[in-house]
Design a protein with these regions (language model features):
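Aromatic- and acidic-residue-enriched carbohydrate-binding clefts of CAZyme catalytic domains
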Residues: 1, 35-71, 100-141
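A short alpha/beta connector and helix-capping loop motif
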Residues: 94-117, 181-202
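An active-site-proximal structural segment forming one wall of the substrate-binding cleft
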Residues: 11-14, 20-24, 28, 69-78, ...
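Residue-level preference for long, well-ordered alpha-helices that form the structural scaffold
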Residues: 58, 62, 143-147, 176, ...
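Active-site mouth loops of central-metabolism enzymes
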Residues: 2-12, 136-150, 248-256
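Active-site-proximal helices and loops of the catalytic beta/alpha 8
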Residues: 2, 16-22, 33-35, 40-49, ...
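Short glycine-centered, acidic/aromatic-flanked micro-motifs in structured strand/loop junctions
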Residues: 6, 56, 170
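Aromatic-lined carbohydrate-binding surfaces of glycoside hydrolases
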Residues: 33-38, 84-104
């Protein structure tokens, strides 16, 4: 599986480039979160990760646009994956607020059972903190059945549109069944058996043991893996976080397009599932011969896992 990550791309622009993506050897695309946002428009890179509810449609495209995209990718033998934000919702405009944004529905805002305690994680090595507290935004209480009902309703609508996979943002902050949180097992039971469908969650800077624990329920999107189950991971050389996030010192921002492409090619030589981040306003970052060669050469790796 060779996935192109298209954060910040309007759906109409993605449709226009599908043949080029296919020609580059990508068999799937991951698009920007489709939930309504607290500020609509081509703003900061992190805005798509501050949704206000669990509906479909924002500045990047409507529900009808999404259905059209899914049809167009299917025609080309490709798949569309949607980035899903369900660990938290948007905050008030002032920095550091853990209060829900005014646009969050009242039935969410005024239900105390919907939310995690209004405290941030201080120790990221403490699993209880990571899954129980907030990460700078109003955290949703995933253990609550009402919250899960809203999420599943949204995911079911995505499936009806023709979406063929979900990428769960901040999956590491949602606990495992072994930790008393019955979300990932329900996700797996509900969607894993759908034909040609992918479920994967973001677990970056996690131990091999933690990655393998999440791997029981889905594929794991991560930046490094040295375990025994490579078929359960999706590797990236660069992500939207490593390129844009000040908290990570934008550590890949200084890499040239060619450096990223060669790092990606190395991953394709070793792993069956990889993701390539399309740098903003830079078609050369994904549309270059090294990436095409990586995708085509990398298909041979499948033989090793069968």
């Amino acid at each position: 599986m060779r996935t192109l990550h298209l954060l910040g791309w309007p759906i109409w622009a993605i449709i226009e480039h599908l043949d080029e993506f296919k020609n580059q050897g990508f068999d799937s695309i991951q698009i920007t979160p489709v939930q309504p946002l607290k500020e609509e428009g081509p703003g900061e890179w992190w805005l798509p990760y501050q949704p206000v509810n669990f509906e479909i449609g924002n500045w990047f495209g409507s529900k009808e646009d999404l259905c059209k995209l899914c049809n167009e990718t299917s025609i080309r033998g490709m798949r569309t994956f949607v980035d899903v934000v369900c660990n938290h919702l948007a905050s008030q405009p002032f920095t550091g607020s853990l209060e829900p944004h005014d646009s969050v529905p009242d039935k969410y805002k005024h239900n105390p059972n919907f939310w995690k305690p209004k405290r941030n994680v201080t120790n990221w090595n403490n699993r209880h903190e990571v899954i129980s507290l907030c990460m700078g935004l109003p955290g949703l209480n995933i253990t609550n059945d009402e919250v899960q009902h809203e999420i599943f309703k949204f995911l079911d609508e995505l499936v009806k549109c023709g979406v063929k996979g979900f990428r769960f943002d901040a999956a590491k902050s949602i606990g495992l069944p072994e930790e008393g949180v019955h979300f990932w097992d329900r996700i797996a039971n509900r969607y894993k058996t759908l034909p040609d469908f992918e479920i994967y969650g973001e677990v970056i800077f996690g131990s091999t043991e933690l990655i393998d624990s999440y791997g029981k329920y889905m594929k794991v999107l991560t930046n490094i893996y040295q375990g025994r189950h490579p078929e359960n991971v999706i590797l990236f050389a660069e992500s939207h976080d490593s390129f844009n996030d000040e908290d990570l010192n934008k550590y890949s921002n200084s890499w040239t397009d060619e450096q990223v492409a060669y790092k990606y090619r190395d991953l394709c030589d070793r792993f069956e599932n990889t993701m390539y981040y399309a740098r903003p306003n830079n078609d050369h970052s994904w549309n270059n011969p090294i990436v095409k060669d990586a995708n085509n050469r990398g298909q041979k790796i499948k033989v090793l896992y069968r």
